[in-house]
Amino acid sequence: MRRLTLKFLPIIIMYFFIIPTLLAQTGPGQYTEEAPLGSWNIFGPDTAAGLGSGFCRLARASSAEVIYFNPALLTKLPPLTLSLSSSFNQTQLFSYWLVNTGVISTRGNLTARTWQLDHLGLSWRAGSWTIGLGMALTENYGRPGLEYRYVYNQVVYNQMQIRQVGHLSGYAIGLAGKLNQRLSLGASLIYERGYLERSLDEFWTQEEIQLLDYRYQKVKGFRAVAGLSYEISGRLSLGLSLSPPYIRKVKGESSLTYLTPLTEIETRSQASDRVKRPLVLGLGGKLVINQHLDAYLDVLYFGWKRYRFSYFGEDQFRNFRDTVRIGAGLEYRTRFRFLGRTWASPYYLGLAVDPQPDLEVRSTYYFLTFGSGLKNELLSLSFSTALGLESGSGHALKRHKLSISLDFHPDLKKNSGKIK
């Protein structure tokens, strides 16, 4: 048995030193180690009203989640607002980590499915000031789990399992005030906290050799957001948002274990890394076409050229470009009386273009979004769907999202019973 162990040592050495080189040559495209699931261009949580109208949010005051991208809109919410949003996400991937990068091949795209609580928050108005609090799941680092087996003559010779999970949460506090009847300013501070966990387990059954590679990282950081809302006229309003570059700090630990019936070798390491996040600028507009129909347009700029990332003490090169995400949408409302109350039923329709920053694989997602809802002066229930198709990678990746949002406005007297 010792002879067999020595025989496989060169293979083990090749596995851990040559494989990273192969990965660097083939590349995972959009899904590098730290890439969020779905898109790099994330700027706060998506709720149903914004999602359904082409991801347009910068000039739309729909719920308390505005503190994540334009806190000035807090002044446009009812005096007391409680917001809850959840979503189901279905995202296709082709290449990531060891999958379709020269080590493990699949016949087609793999799918990651998640159901998550996107946002929970509240806003409260006191005089000319409005304060907002919120917690949100802003990024998901999960990947489809995969198990590989090499079988010959109904005998398993080799098997491998890979797994990656993780997420990033944002805990926000925001303050906004009206300078006059047309102009509002706001600012938010968001504390980000999350983790990323990756594991590889490979086993040669005949020789009873096992390799375990485990990595765990804690992510922390503070992000600031400043916002402006300005009503040019009774029909046209603008929203402006700014989030300056900032640093995420990452604490990581890893263990590499080699097991045989006669040998156990374990190597542990720790690292402190820094991730430089980019500048984000946003401009949004709202046009009231008539009493039933509103139009929205959002443009978001992400300065990915200056993005920097280190992984367990080593700087990783990211060949990124700056990106501009554009969304446009409509909201049409009908009104009716029921049970002594006035109700509104909004219908959403939108389009969005979401280019990814990687220069080697110029990938872009194109979205069709739609949704509906029901609301009165007390509550608002909305649900929307985004259907996305990717172009540029050669794999026609699909991304679907279903969002459900509930907003509760218990302060009826101050709200004057009006539905916006």
Question: What are these language model-derived features?
Answer:
Residues 25-51, 79, 116-420:
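Outer-membrane beta-barrel porins/channels
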Residues 1-7:
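Positively charged n-region of N-terminal signal peptides that target proteins for export
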